[in-house]
Swiss-Prot record:
It comes from Methanothrix thermoacetophila (strain DSM 6194 / JCM 14653 / NBRC 101360 / PT). It comes from the Archaea. SUPFAM superfamilies: Ribosomal protein S19. Signal peptide: none annotated. This is Small ribosomal subunit protein uS19. Keywords: Ribonucleoprotein, Ribosomal protein, RNA-binding, rRNA-binding. One of its GO terms (biological process) is translation. The gene is rps19. It holds the Pfam family Ribosomal_S19.
Length: 136
């Protein structure tokens, strides 16, 4: 069978690059080199150095491939890509798989702390007109 001239082929997903570097290239870089590619707020944070808690979290993530954390201010680094992190949102841990598009963002951005409020129907006496509605 011949293909139609107007039929479209499925698009191939392009490989993700961060500032012109592939994830495999970023993973080989030192922390100082990665910091130079990040936005200024994240760059300043990394220049100050990782805290003891951050280093402990990264070691746990390297060893197991998954880790629970309360460190919402941790920056997603290239070595975290493909790992699963459970981020605390103030009540529970939300499971998040790190993908390349998350590099340079904070972990807290992916575990929302506030839920959308969904109100139920108003009860009897909630409004002035509902006072005269007969009860069942």
């Amino acid at each position: 069978m011949a293909k139609k001239a107007g039929s479209k082929l499925p698009k191939r997903k392009e490989e993700f690059t961060y500032r012109g570097y592939r994830v495999s290239e970023l993973a080989k870089m030192r922390l100082e080199e990665i910091a130079e590619l990040l936005p200024s707020r994240q760059r300043r944070t990394l220049r100050r150095g990782l805290s003891k808690e951050h280093r402990k979290f990264m070691a746990k993530l390297r060893a197991r491939g998954t880790a629970k954390t309360h460190l919402r201010d941790a920056i997603v680094l290239p070595e975290m890509v493909g790992k699963v992190v459970e981020i605390h949102n103030g009540k529970t841990f939300q499971r998040v798989e790190i993908i390349p598009e998350m590099i340079g963002h904070y972990l807290g951005e992916y575990a929302l702390t506030r839920a959308r409020v969904i109100h139920g129907a108003a009860g009897v006496g909630a409004t002035r007109s509902s006072k005269f509605v007969p009860l069942k």
